[in-house]
Curated annotation (Swiss-Prot):
Membrane spanning residue stretches: none
Pfam families in UniProt: OTCace, OTCace_N
Protein name: Aspartate carbamoyltransferase catalytic subunit
A Gene Ontology biological process term: amino acid metabolic process
GO cellular component labels: cytosol
Keywords of the record: Pyrimidine biosynthesis, Transferase
Gene name linked to the record: pyrB
Pathway in which the depicted protein is active: Pyrimidine metabolism; UMP biosynthesis via de novo pathway; (S)-dihydroorotate from bicarbonate: step 2/3
Disulfide bonds: none
Swiss-Prot/TrEMBL catalytic activity: carbamoyl phosphate + L-aspartate = N-carbamoyl-L-aspartate + phosphate + H(+)
The organism of origin for this protein: Prochlorococcus marinus subsp. pastoris (strain CCMP1986 / NIES-2087 / MED4)
């Protein structure tokens, strides 16, 4: 595998098909090693990974730190409450300090959009070699989640050959609080790159019409045979109608902590219309896969029966796949200009 073309991974909007395939290939390789009992390899021995999380996280933070440790990297965690931020230091200065300490990669999560981008610009201006990996920024982007969801769906539809083009023309239903979801935005880039047709479903107040711009604004180099064109995006307010033709469903939670306006009449009404239940799934004649980036709110966007009993509920697969996916991203960043 040659050099990786990106110093930072901030969004999937600049990923080429080759970039996606590099991540998928490495993810599969690392997953196979993990499944074979090889829990640690010396790929990043001597590298320092620093996780800087300004938002609460269970899956993403632990997954990144475990991924780094499985690659034999040194890992340090940043805690805002016990840092110099409490003394007035800026986030930019904190990042520059970690770079000066020799951090090779900063894994950053922040509640505001584009904070990782601004940090990467300051690092580049200072001539630091440190890379930034966006672990989720506001409503903007969550690249690693988009990539692990992409891998999870490809693995489901093409378990042996792992062909990304299997997603071409598949109808992927994304239901829930799309307007506040950085995961949805990353999923749109990744899935439409391989020709998937996306159905965004939810109350009109939670799905902005401008999401259809994601396809038309894609980089030209994302197109490559055997995929003749990017997928489409359509918008629906009916889960019952949308699920009938879906090949897969990605459920999103209601992000009540981000709702600054009264966008819903009531949680009860939302659940009645958009909670994924066995009854709604029965409208589809196929055993379609169900994904959810977590954390889940049982009984609001997805029923416990679907989570616990539905055979193709892939939530735990997503968690498991997150580790090799993030191993792949950390490894690839280490290959930038090497």
């Amino acid at each position: 595998m040659g050099n990786w073309p990106h110093k930072h991974i901030l969004t999937l909007s600049n990923f080429s098909i080759d970039d996606y395939e590099s991540v998928i290939e490495l993810t599969e390789r690392f997953k196979s090693l993990n499944n074979a009992g090889t829990k640690k390899i010396p790929a990043l021995q001597g590298k320092l990974i620093t996780s800087i999380f300004f938002e609460a996280s269970t899956r993403t933070r632990n997954s990144f730190e475990l991924a780094a440790k499985r690659l034999s990297a040194d890992v340090q965690s940043f805690s805002p409450s016990s840092s110099s931020l409490s003394k007035g230091e800026t986030l930019i200065d904190t990042a520059l300090t970690y770079a000066a300490m020799g951090s090779d990669i900063l894994v950053i999560r922040h509640s505001s959009s584009h904070v990782p981008l601004e940090i990467s610009k300051k690092l580049d201006a200072s001539k630091a070699k440190t890379s930034v990996l966006n672990a989720g920024d506001g409503l903007h982007s969550h690249p690693s989640q988009g990539l692990l969801d992409l891998y999870t769906l490809i693995k489901f539809f093409s378990p042996k050959l792992l062909k990304p083009e299997i997603l071409n023309s598949k109808k992927i239903l994304i239901v829930g609080d799309v307007i506040h979801s950085r995961v949805a935005r990353s999923n749109l880039w990744a899935l439409t790159a391989f020709g998937a047709n996306i159905i965004l479903c939810g109350p009109p107040t939670l799905i902005p019409e401008e999401f259809t711009d994601f396809v038309s604004s894609s980089p030209p180099n994302q197109l490559r045979d055997p995929i003749s064109s990017r997928g489409s995006i359509t918008i629906s307010s009916s889960l019952e109608e949308s699920i009938k033709c879906a090949d897969a469903v990605i459920v999103l939670r209601l992000q009540k902590e981000r709702m600054i306006e009264n966008l819903l009449s009531s949680i009860k009404s939302y659940s009645e219309n958009y909670c994924l239940t066995p009854e709604k799934l029965s409208l589809n004649c196929k055993d379609i896969p169900i994904l959810h980036p977590g954390p889940i709110n049982r009984g609001i966007e997805i029923s416990s029966r679907v989570v616990d009993e539905y055979p193709n509920c892939l939530i735990n697969d997503q968690v498991s796949n997150g580790i090799p996916t993030r191993m792949a991203l950390l490894y690839l960043l280490s290959k930038f200009n090497n």
